[in-house]
UniProtKB/Swiss-Prot annotation:
It catalyses: 4 hydroquinone + O2 = 4 benzosemiquinone + 2 H2O. Binds 4 Cu cations per monomer. It comes from Oryza sativa subsp. indica (Rice). This is Putative laccase-19. GO terms for biological process: lignin catabolic process. Keywords: Apoplast, Copper, Glycoprotein, Lignin degradation, Metal-binding, Oxidoreductase, Repeat, Secreted, Signal. Glycans are attached at residues 41, 47, 120, 205, 344, 378, 397, 434, 465. The lineage of its organism: Eukaryota, Viridiplantae, Streptophyta, Embryophyta, Tracheophyta.
Amino acid sequence: MEKLSMVTSLLCAITVAVLAVAVVSGEAAVVEHTFVVHEMNATHLCNTTKIYVVNGQFPGPTVDVMEGDTVVVHVINKLPFGLTIHWHGVRQMRSCWADGAGFVTECPIPPGNEHTYRFNVTGQVGTLWWHAHVTCLRATINGAFIVRPRDGKYPFPTPAKDVPIIIGEWWELDLIELDRRMMDGNFDDNPLSATINGKLGDLSNCSRMVEESFILDVKHGESYLLRVINTALFSEYYFRVAGHTFTVVGADGNYLTPFKTDMVTVAPGEAIDVIMVADAPPAHYHMIALANQPPEPDPQIPVFTSRGLVRYAGATANNNGLPVPMPIMPNQHNTMPSYYFHANLTGLAHPERHRVPMHVDERLFVTLGLGSICRGQNTTCKRRRSPETIVVATMNNVSFAHPKTTALLERYYDGTSKGVYTEDFPIRPPRPFNYTNRDLIPPGPLEEALEPTFKATKLKRFKYNTSVEIIFQSTTLMQSDSNPMHLHGYDVFLLAQGLGNFNAKRDVRKFNYHNPQLRNTVQVPRGGWAAIRFVTDNPGMWYLHCHFEFHIIMGMATAFIVEDGPTPETSLPPPPPEFKRCGNNGLSQP
């Protein structure tokens, strides 16, 4: 945890209170927190950087609740610009107003203002997380959101302790400047290091000053529930502990069939629960978080690594004079371990589990790609070959135009959407093509032939209780990227994933209808596809986007409108009294 300056510490001592009101019983409780969001200086790698944090912490405070509790978080914005807080993976049943998606469900909280989020957590158990949902602020404004079973029982032996393992990135570049640069089409900036729970690790150093590592203290023979969360803006990560194995037991707030592995792969937005038994000889063991990279000759980025330590009780300070074991990591250019890890996970079948909808009312085939548009009002530029173009990310050739002064949910609820958005998001690409043809890697004549791309705020409307199937198809237009697609307000059945082009005649037979994973973030593999289904049982405005930050900024997003059901209990209620409408609220965005 970064240390505050003396002035900030005094300010926090006077003004910051973190309240946790819980009833130690079987009854639901109200869990209350106050988040003060502010700037803070932090020094790493011989440089002092201004970062943005909650309550002086990086990562921020953990929200720890039981299933069925009501969560109340008071956010006080001391930043010079607006922000929102998104409760990543919380289903927000009939509480879309509290989802915290900037300019989708609410306008950002203006500087110097406060906002209260209030929602219930029902039907979910496991690890979720929270983060800022405007610009690139989630790189440092984030934290774990833990939902415990109300009866205290797990479908696996109760661990001695559970520990969030929050994998992130350390940016020397100011995050607001990073956002501005990406908005202008500059995607060449990179973080300096990976982090584990805010620590860069002892592989990072400058002038022989070694960075601090995260240390996990364990006792021999005990088991530990590691809640591995990827908060990074840019990279998927491999995570390993030397001399130890894991049993994967959950993901995104849902239980999984226990799966044994010696490495966890976690994409941006994902939360993976694993059990680690401390069964090695008592000593010290290194843990590694390594960012994977696309295979060469695709565009390369620096290798980001953070090294931590598992320290057994009773082990000597110098590890008995022996070298500390290092885990053997895969080649950072090898993306196949990620594919096999995700493809081997299945949901834990139990009587109360929701069933996969076998009948499909609406089908979408969504290609994930790149395109280019003309800058400003210019409409005559020659696409990629002109300096007047800007590269954008697309879904079915549409790059999402994010609102800048209003919230989509507010306009939908008030019936004032004209001129703000349209409801014609395409359910398939303009024309089929060989989506994984390597000759499509841009720039090139084949890629240019697939233009034009449209920049627009196009949404998709669904009636209540509609069964929806979506096939996400990655394309080589994305060059080398996988795509962790996150849908707000829903858990979706991940029926299957595959490599190459999706072929219904061949691939539908691979669908897992018995025990698929329930996920809020679905990893669409590089050069492959993923199939999901869900039922629109949660009315409101729900954001769908890739969780790579540069893909969001480039426009790989849309929103789903889910209409009210036939009864008050199946309809979106009016905004709560504490909800602040957009209007003339002094909004100041970076």
